[in-house]
Amino acid sequence: DTDRSRGLGDVYKRQAQGKGLRIQPAVQTQAEPAAQTLTVTPPQLTLPCRAAILIDQTSGTVLYEMNADQTMPIASITKVMTLLLTFEAVHAGRLTMDTAVPVSEHAYHMGGSQIWLEPGEQFTLDEMLKAVCVSSANDAAVAVAELVGGSEPAFVQQMNARAAELGMEHTTFRNACGLDTEGHLSTARDVAIMSRTILTTCPEVLHYTGIWTDTLRGGQTQLVNTNKLLRRYNGITGLKTGTTGGAGVCITASATRDGLNLIAVVLGAP
């Protein structure tokens, strides 16, 4: 909710005046140097969730953490890795935003949030990314995964390989969309690593995550963003929500205010 997100967003300001505990940055992408150690006083916050972390996107400095290395389901935040691999395929010249994405029977049978794709339908990659980022559509995410990886199982192997490259030590993906599956687990810290990577290397993702409403099928299908902070929190830019019975309410939120770029991850909220 708005108040909870505002509390995380204000952490940085309180710490800027603090002194005490030395916190070594724990979140950084591969091929980036470690940020300088900062002297900060960690805020005394007890959040109504299972795990959380707040980092400075630019430096990777950890500003707040709670149970950040505890493994748990992350629901549709999983789609951040699906998006990362997709944008990387575009950067490599393997795809364009106009590439047609076919819909398989497998994608059609995805449950949860969806845009009700029909087998044989085709959308451009641009349209599918809107469905994934705005409506968190599981069917669209799996269709994109099949396009990029050839099949969802093959794509999941790519997801896990990329996670290992990024140092996401406690993450195992079992699917491309985040539906509850045994062994499909991550941590708040690993989600922050993944989020920082896509925001840093694929900033075009913000074009999609910042969309509040859009349409598909010539206006017949309405897309409304699942991230309600877009309407309530000054400076919010993304990134991805997630909710399942096993994961609870989750979000990895990116925001920019007064020159600060922050990433807040909350997992397992009621």
Language-model regions, residue ranges each:
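Domain-scale selection of a single, long terminal region
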Residues: 13-18, 270
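Active-site-adjacent loops and short helices of periplasmic peptidoglycan-processing enzymes
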Residues: 19-189, 199-202
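Single conserved hydrophobic/aromatic residue that forms the stacking wall/gate
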Residues: 1-15
